[in-house]
């Protein structure tokens, strides 16, 4: 029999509640001081690592005992993880530090099925946990007794800035709200989303700019600690999409910025993408890069990213302002921008999650959520299925400390078909929690035509028609996948002859103006479209070898889209240098009687199709 030595550090709850204190997380009103009690099972004679694979702490919150279970986040770093900084004379210095025995954990509260935790145990316990639906923060108090910790609700941290902060991505989907409304009503079940054998893996590089370096007192270790905490939370957030994020490299621009970081978020993103394509990708293989900067961008923007761009050499990037003293906030902003890279757009009012605000809200909430909305789940899976980004299919080599698989730890390990936790907590009906094998009767795990691990009945609608040009699809009864999307022929009149069908949609200029500018927008007068004959920055039809070609007179309604917002703004247009196609009239749009836009030319509908 294996003897187990139980090492227990017994400390009582410090009987004190404070009204206000300044902590690393900011000025906190109403906090509780506790001394966590750590219990660790160590096999007798075993060599104990500095940070165990699993740990357990007991303390009290609001006078009630809680047990915090922690498990080391072994997927935090890739095996070839590297760190790069620059000497004062500009020399690149790259190291490959040993990160196997790190101190970053995920966890849960015992007897609270909806609880989560993201904790650094490097110097005491620092991080956040969800308990009975409320978010709490914990961090060490710098008293003479170093084991004292403050525990407080997130809502008790004073606001850092009253002005609302926003993502700079503009909603450009010109179609009606109907698909979003329908998506918001979809119930995406756990078994449909599980994809246990098809996890996606994002190999992430984070670049901290020179302002970040100086913000943290030019101390590389402080920058690294901050980034590790952010990625630990980022990793936790994305597991709900069945995506694992591994940090493959951290680069700190300790001797000045290597791409242009300016007050314009759009210019900064463009320059960072060019640098990544030109330089970083040649030095380090990775899937996505995020620039973490301490600059205060113009306006209220604190983040920006390209949409549906994962794996693209230039555009699989995002920029994030290190806006808050709470790393949870910064991690949520980074999760938001990476969400754009994964094809997820901003939430509409019909989108919901298990919180007041979801991750893809355009406005960053003062109490940010760690959950993606139902709309985000649908958009993500649509992007994965339609665009099929290949770079995130390969699993990075992880920095595992070799240990036998443990059934019930919610990690899919060698020899397991599934792992949904203990029999008491497992919520995944396809999995036998006792054996970590799929039940023998399981027909499917995920897909539009999979429900409760079985194929949905033949004839069940799995893809509603999105317009009169589309055709609804139904399940076959013998496949988990919805049949291939079909639609009416291109060129068929639609919307009472205001448009012509194109790939299942009925594109008309009014819908595009509505999406760009809101309900008060209409299509501008014909005279506004004449600006497309100028061939300037915004008024043109197409680009050839980087040169903007003006529209021919008959093609002006196939170039830049012009909308009217009333007498004050009769010729409004949208233009952004990060994606110059946004704000152009869409292909297939009616541009005249029996004419549609094709290749930026207004041609006969019969010729186009």
From Swiss-Prot:
GO MF term list: metalloendopeptidase activity; metallopeptidase activity; toxin activity; zinc ion binding
Cofactor details (free text): Binds 1 zinc ion per subunit.
Prodomain positions: 21-190, 397-400
Signal peptide: 1-20
Residues binding Ca(2+) 1, per UniProt: 203, 287, 391, 394
Top-level taxonomic group: Eukaryota
Extent of motif D/ECD-tripeptide: 468-470
UniProt record, GO biological process: proteolysis
Name of this chain's protein: Zinc metalloproteinase/disintegrin-like HR1a
GO cellular component: extracellular region; plasma membrane
Keywords assigned: Calcium, Cell adhesion impairing toxin, Disulfide bond, Glycoprotein, Hemorrhagic toxin, Hemostasis impairing toxin, Hydrolase, Metal-binding, Metalloprotease, Platelet aggregation inhibiting toxin, Protease, Secreted, Signal, Toxin, Zinc, Zymogen
Binding site for Ca(2+) 3: 470, 473, 485
Note in the entry: The disintegrin domain belongs to the long disintegrin subfamily.
Cofactor(s) demanded: Zn(2+)
Residues where Ca(2+) 2 binds: 406, 409, 411, 413, 416, 419
Record keyword Electron transport present: no
Organism of this sequence: Protobothrops flavoviridis
Domain called Peptidase M12B: residue spans: 200-396
